[in-house]
Amino acid sequence: MGRIVYVHGDFVPEEEARIGLFDRGFLFGDAVYEVTAVIAGRMIDNDLHLARLERSLGELGIALPLSRPDIEALQAELISRNRLTDGTVYLHVSRGEADRDFLYPETMAPKLVGFTQMKTLTGTKAQREGIAVDLTGDPRWHRRDIKTAMLLGQVMAKQAARARGFDDVWLVEAGLVTEGASSTAHVITADGRILTRAASKATLPGCTQRALARLCEAEGLRIEERAFSPEEAQHAAEAFQTSASSLVMPVVKIGGRMIGDGRPGPMTRRLQSLYLEAAGVPA
């Protein structure tokens, strides 16, 4: 037997999980999702993720399927039933089921699915040595602030980057980096400023980004929220990206150009340690 998953009110073996043919998440990508990191059995930044889930649902006019305490209990139950120590817990809320039509009945009831994934999140080779990211045009729609399940643009960009020998990809629009395909992009200038995009409809508001920003403020580190070009990124002193599944990930090559000496820099190392310490994990 595989994992225990949550589908529309029931905990069932993954082999028995069923999602309706006419679910709008399946037919239209009319759904939102969240992924929360789990380290040593504890959810990390989950309050930020659930707040973002509520915001995304509100932007699409989809009702929250359960109260926040009930969602937290659901997540904890998935972690417990699957004996998850390190990995992620995934939530997916679709608008619901109805016969296929672009217009939907206002009476639809949202559908909630949840599952866990085992994954080593700390001390990985990539976190020790850094990754190389490609640069490509941003193929996505213009409401990237909503964490929608429509991810084909990101899938295509990541697949193309891998085929070119890169580990990941940063997206570019109008001559400026928007974000990573599944992460928030950051660069560090020679004078120690941490640059990252300000919140807007062009980017997803990152939960790990927000948590890290709080830590930086407490430490007196300078964060400048502004857009930067691929060229500025390639000539930065350091670079990194953040996400729930990669935490603080050093970037040592951008679009084929080495960043610094090609190794994770001291500021990035400090940020990794700060984040893990705040999460209660030995650095």
For the regions a language model picked out, list residue spans one by one.
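Secondary-structure junction motif
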Residues: 208-210
